[in-house]
């Protein structure tokens, strides 16, 4: 990095100048940030129309409003099955559950197998669902595959989605959703189709509590994992050696 009259770093030693890096604080292209370092949920929702091919087909991200109640706390609806996004796409969860993730913990990647009708190639099936007739949600086999809809009550969730469905581009979406305890424009829910790998990381300073619904009841045969070593809690090396048994002489 050469020294010029307008160089703010001219006062540094040459070695430091050679190692110097600066950050780009410009907003940058939304699609690139969605697939890279990530965006806030409200940015993704507001920019959906301009994201085009960067958006994973079938994924829904919709805002939720959390009402602050002075001196008492807050109130937030999760969803209504008779209006809004879940009503529009015809998704009525058959099972509800909750989960807690401690600070700095992570889950994933999890993935559920998509149902492919007999006699149809997977790529042709997804082409029909998401390219030829993306608005015809009646063709989606919600009752034969697991879709998830997730809501966050506390903590801050960083979510990463990867489209692994045959014949569709491998898109990545990365965004952040705060829980209801941090009310604001980024409070949102997310719908994840089968065949889309998903990982969650609690990047807040409190436990993350989530509530999620699934389009079918739990089926252990549909619980896939990809690159999920982050979920393991390995024992200390000394413990592993001890548990392996006495050393042979």
Descriptions of predicted regions:
Residues 2-186, 205-209, 214-249:
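Non-catalytic, conserved peripheral segments adjacent to functional cores
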Residues 159-160, 190, 198-203:
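Short beta-strand His + acidic residue motifs that chelate non-heme Fe in jelly-roll/DSBH
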């Amino acid at each position: 990095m050469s020294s010029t009259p307008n160089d703010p770093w001219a006062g540094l030693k040459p070695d430091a100048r050679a190692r110097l890096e600066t950050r780009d604080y410009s907003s940058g292209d939304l699609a690139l940030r969605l697939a890279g370092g990530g965006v806030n949920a409200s940015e993704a929702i507001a920019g959906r129309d301009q994201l085009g091919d960067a958006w994973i087909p079938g994924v829904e991200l919709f805002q939720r409003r959390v009402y602050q109640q002075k001196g008492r706390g807050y109130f937030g609806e999760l969803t209504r099955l008779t209006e809004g996004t879940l009503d529009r796409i015809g998704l009525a969860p058959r099972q509800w559950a909750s989960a807690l993730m401690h600070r700095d913990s992570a889950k994933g990647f999890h993935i559920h197998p998509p149902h492919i009708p007999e006699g149809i190639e997977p790529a042709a099936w997804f082409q029909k669902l998401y390219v030829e007739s993306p608005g015809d949600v009646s063709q989606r086999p919600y009752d034969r595959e697991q879709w998830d809809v997730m809501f966050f009550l506390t903590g801050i969730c960083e979510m990463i989605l990867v489209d692994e469905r045959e014949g569709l581009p491998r898109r990545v979406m990365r965004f952040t959703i705060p829980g209801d305890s941090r009310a604001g424009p980024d409070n949102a829910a997310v719908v994840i189709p089968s065949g889309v790998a998903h990982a969650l990381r609690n990047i807040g300073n409190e436990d993350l509590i989530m509530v999620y619904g699934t389009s079918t009841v739990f089926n252990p045969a549909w619980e896939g994992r990809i690159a999920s070593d982050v979920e393991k809690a390995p024992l200390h090396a000394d413990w592993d050696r001890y548990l392996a048994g006495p050393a042979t002489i």
